[in-house]
Structures are given as C-alpha cells and as structure tokens.
From Swiss-Prot:
The entry's keywords: Transferase
Primary role: Prenyltransferase; part of the gene cluster that mediates the biosynthesis of phenalenones such as herqueinone, compounds that have been reported to treat tumors, bacterial infections and/or mycoses, and rheumatic diseases. The non-reducing polyketide synthase phnA synthesizes the heptaketide backbone and cyclizes it into the angular, hemiketal-containing naphtho-gamma-pyrone prephenalenone. The product template (PT) domain of phnA catalyzes only the C4-C9 aldol condensation, which is unprecedented among known PT domains.
Homology family: Belongs to the tryptophan dimethylallyltransferase family.
Organism: Penicillium herquei
Lineage, top ranks: Eukaryota, Fungi, Dikarya, Ascomycota, Pezizomycotina
Name under which the protein is recorded: Prenyltransferase phnF
Length: 444
C-alpha cells in the first residue's frame, strides 16, 4: 500500500520505518498500514495545523503507529461491524480544541478498539485491546491513576458473560462497542520516555441498563454512587443529583438518552466525569432548557443568543427552519450510530454544579460540510475566536482531502460549546469534532 501524497514531514519520516521490523504477520502489517495511512495521517495533519512541535508529533505518532494501528483490525468492508463512534460505523473521531479555550489550539481523539473487523464472536464485548492501551498508559503517562476506572469497568463491562449471553445483550442494547478510549495530546513532552497524552475512558451505559432493566441514566448514576470513597467528594454527588432532579421532571424516555460516562485516568481528587446526554426535544428552547437543567445551573443566560446564532449560522439559514419537526422515535433516540445534538455535563470534585457543554450536530440540519465550515468561521470571527492565519474551513480541507466539503455532510460531527470546567466562570470552551468517514469512504 502506497503512502498518501499529501502529508507532513514527520509522518513521511515515520512511514519509511513503519512495520518493516515488526513481528506482525504480513496480513496484519497490511491492515496496520491501512490505519496508518488513513487515521494516523489525518492526526499528523491536525497536529501540524495546531503547530505542535516536531518532537511531540514524532513521539505521539510513533506510539500511534506501533500500538493503535495494529489493534484496529482489518480495513473496513461490507462485513465490518459498526462502532458506536462514527455515524458511518467507523471507530474514530478527532477534535480541535480551539485557541481561546486553551492557551493554544490542541488536538484530541477517541478510538474504539473493540474487535469489529472481523468481529470477535467468541467474546464480542471484550475490551482486551483497550485494556492493553490502559496498561501502556500506566507506564508512559504522568499522573496516571486507574482507581475509579477499575470500579467502573466492573460495573459497565460485560465481557465475563458467555458468548451467547454477550450476543443476546448486544442485541438488546443495540450496539457492540464495549468501551472507548480517548487521548488529549499535550503540547510538549515532560520527558523523552513519556507519552504526551492524558487518557480517558468512555463507558456506554446501555449494557448495564439492558441487563438490570433500568434506564441508561440510572445506570450512570448508580455507577457513580458505587465508587468507593465518593462520599469524600460531595460536589460529585450533588452535581449528579442536580441532573437527576431535572430528569425526574421529564418523561421516562429522556433517561434513555445517556450515551457515555467518561472519566480521566488520573487520581480521584483530580478526575472529572463527563456524562453525555441526548436531548429528546429538538427545539432550541428545549435544548437550552436541558443545557441549564431547567435553570438549576445559574448565570448562563448571557450565552443564550451566542448559542442560537451558532446553530443558525452552521445551518446555512436558521436552525428553526432546517431542524427536523418529526416526533422523536425511541429507536432514533437510542441509536448507536445515528447522532443527535447533545449536552454533556462535566462533573468535578471542585465545583458544586455540573458544567454543561452543548454538542451541536449540524449534519442533521445543514446542507453540506462547506455550509457548516463557513457558518462556523463567521461565528468565530464575530466573537473573536478566529485563527488569524487560517480559517477553520481551510484547516479542515488541509486535513481531509478524500472529498470536497460541498459534496455532502459527514466530516463535521459535533461542535461543542460551553462553560469551562467551572460553570460559574464565564469563559467559553469550543471544540470542533470530525470523523474520517472510513466506513463510507475507505480511501485505499
């Protein structure tokens, strides 16, 4: 397989040495090379766009090449099982954290290492490859701690069941993704033998909910309440109950919109929980009400019109005109791959309220990715968030060249906007999420 023509100097140098001395079989080498030439090249371009040093690019991409690419299995084909990450079933999502919400632009990504290409029918909910990554992070990342991760793994992961029981649970839950692992890529190396990343793990609550006959939200709530020593962090418990109080006023169906509980792989006194929630109401007013938890999170109103304008601009007209007016169906609401605008709540031991973030999914109401990019750039320019050297449209075009943005939607997934970790502080944080569409367009 030839290397992609548009790439970065660091990626090109690492490609020349890729897998040549590996102990992998020839087939496994070709599979790993596929993921290297697609996903790793995407990330290399993103790191280049974000002005990471060559040292950090080399350190991270070497790790990705040697550890993640071989664990992603085969090239996508018609028989590939769907991951819950990409709308097309592919196992990857990337994001830019924009300059302004951090000291400089940064790159993050998540990957589903569940064995899906081909599917592992003997242990379909195994998180073997993800656990191998967690073990490697334990050796290579500063401040690693898996205290709460281990407890949550025992609560959310069902790999201990027989193959038949796992298959039945997958059918009931509606997806096969066991867990997802995420990486925040730091701007500098702390030492030559360390990885410049912070790891986090995302647990889908659908298996616990299906097994125990409870809602997905209650699966998350009970998981948090079961953590040993969590009573020492009253803000975590009180923030969880603020969300629960809001949902208790809604129809029961709303509690099935919880997609993930994510936690950082750091010590409990520093770990944050992120709860990803879909909103059953697709109107702006309904989404805003969820974002504020019905007014339970104070002092958010000054952001309301900024959010409305962002949703209008990325729609190409107005969100009110282009959004779906159809009644929400439960199958759509709980779909693993069908995406919806969502809210995630950052629960921290330091803050008495959950910090909300609106995750807009513009593909559901915009004509194409070019409309989304231009609308986003207009909003960033208006509110002083634009990059002085390059528009977001040009940056995304520099990362993805497998098709034109004006062809359709799909590259942009979510645009995240909300308060930073402390919801009482007024600074906003913005992320732009993208997926490589490798199930729709394998590229090679």
């Amino acid at each position: 397989m030839s290397a992609p023509t548009q790439t970065t100097p660091v990626f090109k140098a690492l490609t020349e040495a890729s897998f040549s001395d590996s102990s992998l079989s020839e087939e496994a080498k070709q599979n790993a090379l596929y993921w290297w030439n697609t996903s790793a090249n995407d990330l290399a371009r993103m790191l280049h766009q974000a002005d990471y040093s060559e040292e950090v690019q080399r350190g991270f991409l070497s790790y990705y090449r040697d550890n993640i690419c071989p664990r992603l299995g085969g090239k996508p084909d018609k028989d590939s099982a769907d991951s819950g990450v990409g709308w097309d079933g592919n196992p990857l999502e990337y994001s830019f954290e924009l300059k302004g919400s951090t000291k400089k632009k940064s790159v993050r990504f998540v990957v589903d290492l569940t064995e899906l290409r081909p599917a592992d029918h003997s242990n379909p909910l195994s998180m073997k490859h993800t656990q191998e990554m967690v073990d490697l992070l334990a050796e290579k990342t500063p401040n690693f701690d898996d205290t709460w991760y281990k407890v949550l793994k025992n609560w959310f992961v069902y790999a201990h069941l027989t193959p038949e029981e796992q298959t039945a649970l997958i059918a009931k839950a509606g997806q096969q993704t066991s867990v997802i692992i995420g990486f925040d890529i730091y701007p500098k190396l702390t030492s030559p033998d360390q990885l410049p990343v912070m790891g986090k793990v995302y647990f889908p609550p659908c298996y616990v909910a299906s097994d125990k006959g409870i809602s997905r939200w209650q699966a998350v709530r009970q998981g948090i309440q079961s953590l040993p020593g969590v009573e020492s962090f009253p803000n975590i418990l009180s923030s969880t109950e603020i969300i629960n109080d809001y949902l208790s006023e809604k129809p029961d169906s709303w509690q099935m919109g919880t997609r993930y509980l994510a936690t950082d792989l750091v010590s409990p006194n520093k770990a944050r929980f992120k709860v990803y929630m879909r909103c059953f109401d697709t109107s702006f007013e309904g989404i805003w009400d969820y974002y504020t938890l019905g007014g339970r999170i104070p002092n958010l109103d000054e952001d309301r019109e900024k959010f409305r304008q962002l949703m209008d601009l990325v729609s190409g007209t107005t969100y009110a005109e282009t959004r779906s007016k159809d009644d929400m169906q439960m199958g759509r609401f709980t779909s693993a791959t069908g995406k919806l605008t969502a809210i995630y709540f950052n629960i921290s031991p330091d803050n008495p309220y959950p910090a909300p973030k609106l995750c807009i999914y513009p593909s559901n109401f915009a004509k194409d990715d070019e409309v989304i990019a231009k609308g986003l750039d207009e909003w960033l320019e208006k509110y002083g968030w634009s990059d002085d050297t390059k528009s977001m449209e040009d940056q995304v075009k520099s990362v993805f060249d497998h098709r034109k943005l004006e062809e359709t939607t799909g590259i942009f997934t979510f645009i995240g906007i909300g308060r930073k970790e402390d919801p009482t502080k007024k600074e906003l944080s913005i992320q732009v999420y993208m997926t490589p569409e490798l199930y729709r367009t394998p590229r090679y």
